[in-house]
């Protein structure tokens, strides 16, 4: 005979699914009367990577700025692990920003500080580490992003791709639960874009980060995404698994994928456009 399950086991079995770490619900925002996002909903579970796709100007980065509290929605709810953030004061948002960090397009590094000092900055701000511990963590983070050869260099001397790698290291120094990436492959060559994609994927696998990546680069998204949010004219045209997005017959999605299938030659000249392999 089988033993009857205990009350504790029944409770675990019947427990509700884990609440998403990020939950956008019917969010709208307009600038100067012009709708930017309209009734947009999506969620991200812990450890997942969401890629937000769409053409320029459809509000992809606006969603990240609302998550950070830099913008407030006109309507809708934004919840972080069940906590509504749209009504939080700036002080309340500072606590949220200890758990969620953002890697900006320009890296947002301090120009007057070396790579080492940039990565050390958030560690020193914590105030609970001695200098030996700070330097040990800095070396570990710089090694993680492959920037060991530029530790004493100022950001102005770095390429765009290197700046973003260092910005990721500095973001990780804050020990966040969620990392937001705003167009990480813009203005970098395909080799650097692949390196950044490998880095973001490795961080997910090793450290279990939850990530949201805003990008227009479908190749990049294919390598990273568990979930896809596709924005068209400010609305969520698709939200769901990557496989479903790739198979969608929505005409706007098919057009986006078709245009992305073409790449310019590496050098200008008479070479024709070539399709993605």
Where are the regions a protein language model picked out?
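Helix-to-loop junction immediately C-terminal to a conserved catalytic motif
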Residues: 68
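Conserved ABC ATPase "signature" region
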Residues: 83-84, 131-149
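Conserved catalytic motifs of ABC-family nucleotide-binding domains
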Residues: 175
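Catalytic Walker B motif of ABC-type/P-loop ATPase nucleotide-binding domains
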Residues: 179-182
């Amino acid at each position: 005979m089988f033993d009857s399950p205990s009350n504790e086991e029944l409770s675990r079995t019947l427990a509700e699914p884990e609440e998403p770490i990020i939950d956008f619900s019917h969010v709208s925002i307009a600038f100067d009367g012009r709708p930017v996002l309209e009734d947009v909903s999506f969620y991200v579970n812990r450890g997942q990577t969401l890629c937000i796709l769409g053409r320029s100007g459809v509000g992809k980065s606006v969603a990240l700025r609302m998550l950070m509290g830099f913008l407030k929605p006109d309507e809708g709810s934004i919840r972080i692990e069940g906590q509504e953030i749209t009504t939080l004061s700036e002080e309340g948002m500072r606590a949220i920003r200890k758990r969620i960090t953002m890697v900006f397009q320009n890296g947002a590094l301090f120009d007057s500080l070396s790579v080492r000092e940039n990565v050390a900055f958030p560690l020193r701000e914590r105030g609970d580490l001695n200098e030996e511990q700070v330097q040990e963590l800095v070396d570990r983070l710089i090694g993680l992003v492959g920037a060991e050869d530029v530790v004493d260099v100022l950001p102005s001397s770095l390429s765009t791709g290197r700046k973003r790698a260092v910005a990721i290291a500095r973001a990780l120094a804050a020990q966040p639960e969620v990392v937001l990436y705003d167009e990480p492959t813009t203005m970098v060559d395909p080799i650097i874009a692949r390196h950044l994609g490998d880095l973001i994927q490795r961080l997910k696998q090793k450290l279990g980060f939850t990530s949201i990546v805003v990008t227009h680069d479908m190749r990049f998204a294919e390598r990273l995404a568990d979930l896809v949010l596709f924005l068209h004219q400010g609305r969520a045209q698709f939200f769901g698994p990557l496989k479903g997005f790739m198979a969608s017959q929505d005409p706007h999605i098919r057009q986006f994928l078709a245009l992305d299938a073409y790449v310019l030659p590496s050098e200008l000249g008479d070479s024709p456009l070539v399709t993605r392999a």
